[in-house]
């Protein structure tokens, strides 16, 4: 059936004024919201019912029409349509602006799209838009050219007239001066008076000359401006411009504000501009070419989409529905309102004032000021604070604009579309439930009743315990007896989901069958704690209820805890026995010498148990017990024991073992080889690993439960306790320390005599004290008796490690100062002895730094996970096989000194769980395994035994699927151990596998004993981030750009490494820091890509010099290096998925005859497709350069604008996408979650949506043992959808419902 939400693409574009008017249901003319007396929305206001619909269902504003029977009528009195009030969530209004305004996203975003289109600097744009300068819109070139001679003559004439006037006025004044001087002479005036008269006249003449000269120069400037006038020029508002407008206004048009921009955009010829820019790109160089490329990108997007650039200037502002910007009455009668209403109010007020001023014909300066204020009001509405100071509300808080509603963690995308709260859920504290089976959890009765309430109510009515819903509800609220019976029936075989935050990987949500328990705490199976990273110190967990039959099926089949035994990150079991269980099993399987019953023989385990109960036999005594039908692994059977072909003993066998070990083996499957060893942490891990490989999950889960039960049982009986007397300080400690004290004093003495430097002294002291600490630790371990409880806990792997014991019983050792440098004086006391004040003080630095670091790490690791998920969320298994013959050559073994093959230590996480891309051939040239074979543990052993050292395996890095990856290249799913299914979201699993252990990685750089040096290499989490972001590392080492010979030039100030290539090219010069440690010597021959000094390498350089395969190796190896150093196993294929995403784009260098733009980033798949099409037409193909992008940049460069916008830089992404008229193909997960569709992965894939399931008779009988369906009208199979396993929810099918 087709759904309304079934569409393939989602496009975003630029809305024109007509679009906005089409969406609108009326114009908002008044800034009023709600009438304070009647509390009804004001007419034509921001909440007007005439525009947005009635505020009460089926009722007009004046109350003339009430009830649903008047549906669709528009009241003639108040003008309100009678309909549901829900329309107030979807009906929009609009504001008709009295003057156009620019959209701030297009003008102020970086880069400024308007600026690129009009080829203007953002500064100049701002001057025009905010009324600080005029912009020339058009010039009538023909008329100007035609009239130029006449106008020039006129102007010259005017200038001549002015000059004549000036000269005549000066001459007249000179004449007057002479007359005055003659008169003064006649009067016999003093020389002072004459001089004053002369000075006065000269001053007057100067002023006259200056005034005339200014007029003449102004005319000349006006003329020059007129002659050189061109479109797009900016003119300040001054006398020259006003004169220019008065004199030559008919030849040109100049405007201010958004109106100017609008007129320019309307007259803009996109095609001509595109041609011009292509020409510039072909001929230009440097900055000019780069700018032309950027401008062409903007021009092309408008040409391609048919969007009108004039839509970037608004004449109409849309008003969003009132329910999305609500106004609510508070208790005190005051109102709380959304900030948007204030911002809309400002726009309406200013718009109305401007309209009034225009009607009154106000002076231009006042009108312009009002237009500028309107522009600022609309800016604040769209993106408050983007330009100038933000508009603030009460308490100086910046108001939340439309952009802020979308941005960030609290924005619409991340808060409401990607993370919704769900119904049918609860949360409570967790406690341990050791009696549970692996697939069960304990659900508090009250909680279960609340969660299943609707189902309980329905069942009560079906069973006639209640007549109607109200009565049933009352029964539930009063907790009647029948209610619990019904709840018990409903809950049977109905899975619930348990989730513990933070959900770092997919094992953070698992399904369990609930068991009703008393109390209010959820009971959790102890073996699943590791997957949830849960402990019982107050952790809480949430419970969710899968409702539909499909959801229940998925929960039971895919998410049940007993089906999730393996970790998706490395394929190893996650449900390992821990702590109490380990100590119990260790106690059970230990062998003790000289204890009761040693050497006795028993006819059966039962007889041995009897002897133990009678206290004549110790659990750990070495005895002989007759056992039947036991299995042994290859070469493990005792001498003289006969085995059949399956490894099973023929007849009974008298086995030398302990009773404990015999009991332990009873917990394992019948045909599992007999374990004759101490079950410590390592051994148990091996056993569980083996079980997971050999047996179906049901069998493994049962065995794990038996192991768990045995562990707890014997832990209780082992009586393990800890007292202070168990912490034994080694008696030789003082003697050991005094010896090292002497050595330290000697080193200090040498330093004081000036024989060694401070750095050498520190280094030597650190080495001395490290040796001392190690020796004390060794003495302490030797001093602890084997049956010491602390020793048992640590050596069995149940809890703690020797370092912790050493600090309690031996000595604390060296600690570091706040800078991270090691203090060369150790803490010689242990916690058992107590620390001195100074020792306590210096040890607090490290402890506090540890806590601060952990807090930082958690946040950093979370952000890394988010970026990884974002970049890889559309990597889904899309096909079975892409058909490529490419692959990676990976080592599986090396040749030992004796010629034998030594297994490579990283095989588990490199070639394991993949398939061969080519035949595996040994040195003799024999094919050991054909291409396409699955590489598992058995196959690896087989290959190594046959002498194969390197194999070529399929990898996602070489997969040629256009979208997602193929199953053959990915290989086995590590979580199931089988070939990955189509629809598996391998991208997100990869991101979780890398991100989940992120918190365990150390922070910052490591300092090598003391002062920071160039050897400080970024490690831990920051290094992983540096690699995934493809950043140039700090102090990056250059790599040889060709094979050649090295020359080192050393001067006082600097050092250079010069590489002379073998092929006679120009030498390459690398400046190197003086303190850097070189890896090459003078005169040495180096190969292409060889590192020149100690430090990290820039991935971009590796790509440029050595190519794609090498940069892939560099990134995968670098990330693995960090995780391995922390002992965290992650399979290479997860890192490869991310690296594939980092390398999927290419930059177009030459566009040839394709429609690609030079400098454009395109998907490699699209680039190849375009080139293929161009080749078939016989045209010139494009050429491109491979790019390595950081994960943040790669996430933003995705094809999906929805995914990019919900990740980061929301406004920038949306601006660009709207301008380009982008279509979202809805291939990834996020975009489908945002629009509320099923994700195109797993069971949400289209191919899995049309499966019909029919229930067998057996299944029906199983579900309803007490009912017989004979009546066709009651139970018509064609009306139902069934799931072919025995777990229907009890409320799904009830007689009498489906007729």
From Swiss-Prot:
Q: What is its EC number?
A: 2.7.7.6
Q: Name one GO molecular function term.
A: DNA binding
Assembly information from the UniProt record: The RNAP catalytic core consists of 2 alpha, 1 beta, 1 beta' and 1 omega subunit. When a sigma factor is associated with the core the holoenzyme is formed, which can initiate transcription.
List positions binding Mg(2+): 535, 537, 539
Entry cofactor note text? Binds 1 Mg(2+) ion per subunit.
- Keywords recorded for this protein, A-Z: DNA-directed RNA polymerase, Magnesium, Metal-binding, Nucleotidyltransferase, Transcription, Transferase, Zinc
The family line of this record is: Belongs to the RNA polymerase beta' chain family.
Q: Which cofactor(s) are needed, names only?
A: Mg(2+); Zn(2+)
- GO cellular component terms given for this protein: DNA-directed RNA polymerase complex
Superkingdom to which the source organism belongs? Bacteria
Q: Name one GO biological process term.
A: DNA-templated transcription
NCBIfam families, alphabetically?
PRK14906.1, rpoC_TIGR
Reaction(s) this enzyme catalyzes, per UniProt: RNA(n) + a ribonucleoside 5'-triphosphate = RNA(n+1) + diphosphate
Summary of the function given for this chain in its UniProt record: DNA-dependent RNA polymerase catalyzes the transcription of DNA into RNA using the four ribonucleoside triphosphates as substrates.
Where on this chain does Zn(2+) 1 bind? 60, 62, 75, 78
Q: What is this protein called?
A: DNA-directed RNA polymerase subunit beta'
Supply the HAMAP family for this chain.
RNApol_bact_RpoC
Question: Binding of Zn(2+) 2: at which residues?
Answer: 882, 959, 966, 969
Q: Where is this region: Disordered?
A: 188-209
């Amino acid at each position: 059936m087709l759904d309304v939400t079934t569409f393939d693409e989602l496009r975003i574009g630029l809305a024109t004024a007509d679009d906005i008017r089409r969406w609108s249901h009326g114009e908002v003319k008044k800034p009023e919201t709600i009438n304070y007396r009647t509390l009804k929305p004001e007419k034509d206001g921001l909440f007007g019912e005439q525009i947005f619909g009635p505020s009460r269902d089926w009722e007009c504003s004046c109350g003339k029409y009430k009830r649903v029977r008047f549906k669709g009528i528009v009241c003639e009195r108040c003008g309100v349509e009678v309909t549901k009030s829900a329309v107030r969530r979807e009906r929009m209004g609009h504001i008709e602006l009295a003057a156009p305004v620019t959209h701030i996203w297009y003008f102020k975003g970086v880069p400024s799209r308007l600026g690129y289109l009009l080829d203007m600097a953002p500064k100049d744009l701002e001057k025009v838009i905010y009324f600080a300068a005029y912009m020339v819109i058009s010039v009538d070139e023909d008329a100007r050219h035609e009239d130029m001679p006449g106008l020039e003559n006129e102007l010259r004439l005017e200038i001549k007239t002015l000059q004549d006037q000036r000269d005549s006025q000066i001459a007249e004044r000179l004449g007057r001066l002479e007359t005055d001087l003659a008169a003064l002479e006649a009067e016999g005036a003093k020389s002072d008076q004459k001089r004053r008269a002369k000075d006065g006249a000269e001053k007057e003449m100067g002023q006259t000359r200056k005034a005339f000269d200014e007029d003449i120069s102004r005319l000349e400037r006006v003329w020059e401006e007129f002659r050189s006038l061109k479109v797009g020029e900016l003119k300040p508002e001054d006398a020259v411009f006003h004169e220019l407008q008065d004199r030559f206004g008919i030849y040109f048009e100049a405007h201010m504000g958004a109106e100017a921009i609008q007129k320019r955009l309307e007259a803009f010829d996109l095609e001509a501009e595109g041609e011009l820019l292509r020409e510039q790109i072909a001929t230009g160089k440097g900055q000019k070419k780069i700018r032309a490329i950027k401008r062409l990108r903007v021009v092309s997007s408008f040409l391609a989409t048919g969007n009108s650039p004039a839509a970037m200037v608004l004449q109409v502002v849309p008003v969003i529905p009132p329910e999305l910007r609500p106004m609510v009455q508070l208790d005190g009668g005051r109102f709380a309102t959304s900030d948007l209403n204030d911002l809309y109010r400002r726009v309406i007020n200013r718009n109305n004032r401007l309209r009034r001023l225009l009607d009154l014909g106000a002076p231009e300066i006042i009108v312009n000021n009002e237009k500028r204020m309107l522009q600022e009001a609309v800016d604040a509405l769209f993106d408050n604070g983007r330009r100038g100071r933000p508009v603030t509300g009460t308490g100086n808080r910046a108001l939340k604009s439309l952009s802020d509603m979308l941005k960030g963690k609290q924005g619409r995308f991340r808060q409401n579309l990607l993370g919704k709260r769900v119904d049918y859920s609860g949360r409570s504290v967790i406690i341990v439930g050791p009696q549970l089976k692996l697939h069960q959890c304990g659900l508090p009765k009250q909680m279960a009743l609340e969660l299943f309430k609707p189902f309980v109510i329905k069942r009560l009515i079906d069973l006639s315990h209640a007549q109607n819903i109200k009565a049933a509800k009352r029964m539930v609220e009063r907790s009647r007896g029948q209610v619990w019976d019904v709840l018990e029936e409903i809950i049977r075989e109905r899975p619930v989901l348990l989730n513990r935050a933070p959900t770092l990987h997919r094992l953070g949500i698992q399904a369990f069958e609930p068991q009703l328990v008393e109390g209010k705490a959820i009971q959790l199976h102890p073996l699943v704690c590791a997957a949830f990273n849960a402990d019982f110190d107050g952790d809480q967990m949430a419970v969710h209820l899968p409702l539909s039959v499909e959801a229940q099926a998925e929960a039971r089949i895919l998410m049940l805890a007993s089906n999730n035994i393996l970790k998706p990150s490395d394929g190893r079991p996650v449900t390992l026995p821990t702590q109490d269980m380990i100590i119990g099993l260790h106690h059970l399987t230990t062998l003790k010498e000289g204890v009761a019953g040693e050497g006795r023989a028993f006819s059966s385990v039962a007889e041995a148990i009897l002897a133990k109960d009678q206290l004549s036999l110790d659990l750990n005594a070495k005895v002989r017990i007759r056992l039947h039908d036991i299995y042994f692994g290859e070469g493990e059977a005792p001498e003289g024991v006969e085995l059949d072909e399956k490894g099973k003993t023929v007849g009974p066998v008298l086995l030398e073992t302990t009773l404990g070990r015999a009991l332990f083996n009873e917990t394992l499957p019948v045909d599992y080889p007999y374990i004759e060893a101490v079950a410590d942490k390592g051994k148990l891990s091996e056993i569980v690993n083996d079980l997971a490989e050999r047996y179906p999950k049901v069998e493994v889960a049962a065995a794990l439960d038996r192991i768990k039960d045995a562990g707890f049982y014997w832990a209780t009986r082992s009586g393990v306790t800890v007292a202070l007397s168990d912490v034994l300080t080694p008696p030789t400690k003082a003697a050991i320390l005094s010896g090292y004290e002497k050595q330290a004093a000697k080193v200090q003495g040498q330093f004081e005599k000036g024989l060694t430097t401070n750095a050498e002294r520190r280094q030597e002291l650190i080495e001395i004290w490290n040796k001392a600490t190690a020796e004390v630790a060794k003495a302490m371990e030797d001093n602890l008796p084997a049956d010491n409880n602390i020793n048992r806990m640590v050596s069995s792997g149940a809890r703690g490690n020797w370092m912790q014991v050493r600090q309690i019983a031996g000595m604390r050792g060296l600690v570091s100062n706040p800078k991270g440098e090691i203090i060369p004086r150790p803490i010689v006391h242990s916690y058992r002895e107590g620390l001195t004040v100074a020792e306590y003080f210096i040890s607090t630095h490290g402890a506090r730094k540890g806590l601060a670091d952990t807090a930082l790490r958690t946040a950093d690791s979370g952000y890394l996970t988010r970026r990884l998920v974002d970049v890889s969320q559309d990597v889904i298994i899309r096909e079975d096989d892409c058909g490529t013959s490419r692959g990676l050559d990976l080592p599986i073994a090396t040749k030992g000194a004796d010629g034998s093959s030594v297994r490579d230590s990283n095989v588990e996480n490199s070639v394991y769980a993949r398939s061969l891309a080519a035949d595996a051939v040994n040195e003799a040239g024999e094919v050991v395994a054909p291409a396409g074979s699955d590489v598992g543990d058995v196959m690896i052993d087989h290959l190594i035994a046959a002498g194969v050292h390197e194999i070529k395996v399929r990898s996602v890095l070489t997969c040629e699927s256009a979208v997602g990856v193929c199953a053959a290249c990915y290989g086995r799913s590590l979580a199931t151990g089988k070939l990955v299914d189509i629809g598996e979201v391998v991208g997100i699993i990869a991101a979780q596998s890398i991100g989940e252990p992120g918190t365990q990685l150390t922070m910052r750089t490591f300092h090598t004993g003391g002062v920071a040096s160039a050897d400080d290499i970024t490690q831990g989490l920051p290094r992983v981030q540096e690699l995934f972001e493809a950043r140039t590392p700090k102090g990056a080492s250059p790599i040889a750009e060709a094979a050649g010979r090295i020359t080192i030039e050393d001067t006082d100030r600097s050092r250079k490494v010069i590489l002379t290539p073998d092929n006679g090219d120009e030498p390459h010069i690398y400046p190197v820091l003086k303190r850097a440690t070189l890896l090459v010597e003078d005169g040495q021959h180096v190969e292409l890509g060889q590192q020149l000094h100690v430090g990290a390498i820039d991935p971009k350089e590796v790509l440029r010099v050595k190519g794609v395969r090498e940069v892939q190796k560099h990134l995968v190896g670098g990330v693995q290096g960090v995780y391995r150093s922390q002992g965290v196993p992650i399979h290479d294929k997860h890192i490869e998925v991310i690296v594939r995403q980092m390398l999927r784009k290419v930059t177009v260098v030459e566009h040839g005859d394709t429609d690609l733009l030079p400098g454009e980033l395109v998907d490699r798949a699209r680039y190849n497709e375009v080139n293929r099409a161009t080749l078939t037409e016989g045209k010139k193909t494009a050429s491109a350069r491979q790019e390595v992008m950081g994960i943040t940049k790669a996430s933003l460069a995705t094809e999906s604008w929805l995914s990019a916008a919900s990740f980061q830089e929301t406004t920038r992404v949306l601006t660009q996408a709207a301008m380009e008229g982008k279509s979202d193909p809805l291939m990834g997960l996020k975009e489908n979650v945002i629009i509320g569709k099923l994700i195109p992965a797993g069971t949400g894939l289209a191919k899995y949506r049309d499966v019909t399931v029919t229930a067998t008779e057996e299944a029906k009988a199983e579900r309803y043992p007490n009912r017989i369906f004979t009546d066709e009208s009651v139970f018509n199979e064609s009306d139902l959808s069934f799931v072919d396993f025995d777990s229907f929810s009890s409320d799904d099918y009830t007689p009498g419902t489906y007729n």
